Curated annotation (Swiss-Prot):
Pfam families recorded: GKRP-like_C, GKRP_SIS_N
Functional summary from the UniProt entry: Specifically catalyzes the cleavage of the D-lactyl ether substituent of MurNAc 6-phosphate, producing GlcNAc 6-phosphate and D-lactate.
Gene from which this protein is expressed: murQ
UniProt-annotated catalytic positions: 87 (proton donor), 118
Biological process according to GO: amino sugar catabolic process; N-acetylmuramic acid catabolic process; peptidoglycan turnover
Keyword set, alphabetical order: Carbohydrate metabolism, Lyase, Phosphoprotein
EC class of the enzyme, as a word: lyase
SUPFAM superfamilies linked: SIS domain
Designated name of the protein: N-acetylmuramic acid 6-phosphate etherase
Alphabetized GO MF terms: carbohydrate derivative binding; carbon-oxygen lyase activity; ether hydrolase activity
Amino acid sequence: MSEPLNLHRLTTESRNSQTVEIHKANTLGILKMINNEDMKVAAAVQEVLPDIKTAVDCAYESFQNGGRLIYTGAGTSGRLGVMDAVECPPTYSVSPDQVIGIMAGGPEAFLQAAEGIEDSEEAGAEDLRNIQLTSNDTVIAIAASGRTPYAAGALRYARKVGAHTIALTCNENSAISKDADHSIEVVVGPEAITGSTRMKAATAHKMILNMISTAVMVKIGKVYENLMVDVNVSNKKLKERAISIIQSLTNASYDTARYTLEQADHHVKTAIVMLKTSTDQKQAQTLLDEANGFIDKAIEHYHP
């Protein structure tokens, strides 16, 4: 006979005293109760900023050593990792292999729940084995409960390989935190609907993943001022955004910005350096290469 999981001991599974009569509320009352709970999320995230910093530093070190940032999780947790990972290539022109989201059950589970797989530690390890995990990588295992076997298996395997390991959960002193080098335990309190961790827990985790990937991209030079200067110009909307970015940083006219972007092979950074230094595409690209992709350093290094 299997032992009970004792989920009632977890904060994420506790009943919320503020919403016990949500079933009696009218539509606006229901929404107010949910909104009141959601307002607690940002404050909870603020409490764990030092732990988030550690995760950013690990990912940055991995990138510097040719490694990757890998999110892994089951159910909603896995979907959050995939969502963050797939936005990095269009936003920052990084390779799809640099930030990876792995979900228990594979891509099919994103659209149709495959809940049973979360109980397999071996599946968590196997999915990392399949992408040839190395000691240069950073693995962030996401599990609101902090006890999901799939996440635990992933962390244990990653630790054995020598990768940086981080547990992201919503319960203090969680089981998977013991399997990781570092942990981010963002305690958002009981959910408006008991145990529905797709609500506050998922919101907190989405915020944290946004912060981690964004901060790392800033640190590797993908952002100048507060503009996404490495945006992948892959459609009309992004081309217009790229032109606007170039105009904002160089005071060029629309036509000049568009022409220079085209001359720069639609590489925004190169176009900016071309206009800032009055160089051609080849010279500007060389300056950027010598500056490891940082626009300000490329401009500083230029000597006419």
